Amino acid sequence: MSEVASVTDAQIEKFSLLYKERRKVQMMRFFGVTALTLISARLAFKGVASRKYIPTMFQLNHKPPPFSYKGEVVNALAYGTALSTGGFAMLGFGLCWIWDVSTLKELGNKLKELMGDGSEKDKLVSTNMDLDEDTQKVADALEAMLSTKK
């Protein structure tokens, strides 16, 4: 029971603050990428809408407006790259935010687990991870609390 008393509310609050800060960073990354994707989508839409040919009273309705082929290619490449990169970044950061993943190894393990890879060697198990002193105290205290309630 002395192990339970060794974990103070301040230590638990510290880990809670670290967790909240990590989740906030994940959220801000997702919303930042979302904002950039929406801005690039708006620019692409305006670029397409500005090229629409609307003839006036006595102009031909099938005459294409003059434009630069190089400029069109550069604009299309830039808009396409921005939209696809933004979409994939939103997918990646959104999954990391939803699954509470902080590292690429955690993300890889989560994806393997979802796809049915049953190998146990890559799973993150708390007994295999090196814990710092404060985390070890909290883990020991929680294990002691759970074992005394049986």
From Swiss-Prot:
Main localization (coarse): membrane
Recorded coiled-coil stretches: none
Location of this chain's protein in the cell: Membrane
GO CC, any one term: mitochondrion
Natural source organism: Kluyveromyces lactis (strain ATCC 8585 / CBS 2359 / DSM 70799 / NBRC 1267 / NRRL Y-1140 / WM37) (Yeast)
Transmembrane annotation, as ranges: 28-45, 77-99
Membrane topology: Multi-pass membrane protein
Protein name: Altered inheritance of mitochondria protein 11
Family to which this protein belongs: Belongs to the AIM11 family.
Key words of the record: Membrane, Transmembrane, Transmembrane helix
